[in-house]
Amino acid sequence: MIKIFELKSIISIKDFERKDIDYILDEASKLEDIAKSKECCDELKGKILGLMFFEPSTRTRLSFETSMKRLGGNCIGIENTRSCSVSKGESIADTAKMFEGYSDALVIRHELEGVSKFISDIVDVPVINAGDGAGQHPTQTLLDLYTIKKELGQIDNLKIALVGDLKFGRTVHSLSNALGLYDNVELYFVAPKELRMPQEVLHDLNKKNIPYTEVDSIEEIIDKVDVLYVTRIQKERFGDLDEYLKIKGAYIVNKKMLEGKDVIVMHPLPRIDEIATDLDNTKHNKYFNQAFNAVPVRMAILKTLIKNNPKWNHIE
């Protein structure tokens, strides 16, 4: 049975089994032609998606909006707390209940971990977590996996390095959890000691017997990996600007570093300067393809959740 059809909401990638992920990736592949042609279908005609974004977002918000419209639906939403009654003191719960009355599904982004789960417990429509603090970002993980499979033909048997802020980066937390579902995957975590992968993520990998190695520099692993997944070092996490500049400068990927190598480079974006622009026109650059892949993948997610609500049909 496909577990995704039992889920009312998508809150954490930990709720997925491999077959659920494979189902979404297959659905995304079928919908990619619609995404590329920039045409629309009628899969979700008459449906409305509520976008509740309490934290800044460009790609996630726009790709969800694009995905819904490509499926024939429409969107309503807020982009920050200033644009809704939360700024007047209204509770998140009341705002969510109001959105529930107007929408067939909700997409939530919030700076606090756990808000999406809280909202999913008080509304009857599907809820999609679009990032909660330093917690999870499950739909980003699905499009990351889609990109890897599309570019390399598989996810099994790959060596993948996650680089940058692994402590606070929710994308790498979710991605690590998901990669643990695949066979013979080896993970390399490249980060300064202040920003290493949280122990709870490492604990989950240990339980699944997923091999991983923690290193301090990109140079230690660059000859070993198939995928380099780069994230920005977050300036706001450092009290000392000099320390930030020192660490940031040690985690920059450029064209010269990758000469003669077949590694693909991914990034959830936005980038600051951790990937040099001289990489943009090389075979290594997959981060712009990755950004586009958000549309077919999120189309697949929306179609799966909304079209099957409220009966949640099961597929054997």
UniProtKB/Swiss-Prot annotation:
Its EC number is 2.1.3.2. SUPFAM superfamilies: Aspartate/ornithine carbamoyltransferase. Gene3D superfamilies: Aspartate/ornithine carbamoyltransferase. Carbamoyl phosphate binds at R59, T60, R109, H137, Q140, L269, P270. Catalyzes the condensation of carbamoyl phosphate and aspartate to form carbamoyl aspartate and inorganic phosphate, the committed step in the de novo pyrimidine nucleotide biosynthesis pathway. Pathway: Pyrimidine metabolism; UMP biosynthesis via de novo pathway; (S)-dihydroorotate from bicarbonate: step 2/3. The keyword Ribosomal protein does not apply. One of its GO terms (molecular function) is amino acid binding. NCBIfam families: asp_carb_tr, PRK00856.1. Keywords: Pyrimidine biosynthesis, Transferase. Belongs to the aspartate/ornithine carbamoyltransferase superfamily. ATCase family. This is Aspartate carbamoyltransferase catalytic subunit. GO terms for biological process: 'de novo' pyrimidine nucleobase biosynthetic process; 'de novo' UMP biosynthetic process; amino acid metabolic process. Heterooligomer of catalytic and regulatory chains. It comes from Methanobrevibacter smithii (strain ATCC 35061 / DSM 861 / OCM 144 / PS). The keyword ATP-binding does not apply. Pfam families: OTCace, OTCace_N. L-aspartate binds at K88, R170, R232. InterPro entries: Asp/Orn_carbamoyltranf_P-bd, Asp/Orn_carbamoylTrfase, Asp/Orn_carbamoylTrfase_sf, Asp_carbamoyltransf, Asp_carbamoyltransf_Asp/Orn-bd. PANTHER family: ASPARTATE CARBAMOYLTRANSFERASE, ORNITHINE CARBAMOYLTRANSFERASE, MITOCHONDRIAL. It catalyses: carbamoyl phosphate + L-aspartate = N-carbamoyl-L-aspartate + phosphate + H(+). The gene is pyrB. It is an enzyme of class 2 (transferase).
